[in-house]
Amino acid sequence: MYVIASFENFKGTSYHVLDVLSFHFNGSKGTCVIVGGIPPILEPFLKDWANKNDIHLVQCTKDDFKDLDMLFGDISVIIFGMNTFLLKKSLELSLRYYIIKEE
């Protein structure tokens, strides 16, 4: 299972992020690909969550992530805040996507 996430322009809390990610993984092992970096305030919480839940955490830039179609299987895209690049790519490839906004 892959969850692709972005935190561009996200103002929510670490608890909200971890709840959403946990819901999508639902106890499964997998890979969480972070596009565009992790906000410093979220980083320790996200890394701890990934270690405890056997989730492989990968960070990449938008330029590194042009080959989104190379991923296969169960893929969910979660956009925390707004990332138009990732939204456009999700629509192009008909991927399941969720936009999470919390001010």
Question: Which stretches of residues belong to each language-model region?
Answer:
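Short, hydrophobic/glycine-enriched beta-strand segments
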Residues: 1-8
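Acidic/glycine-enriched connector segments
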Residues: 8-103
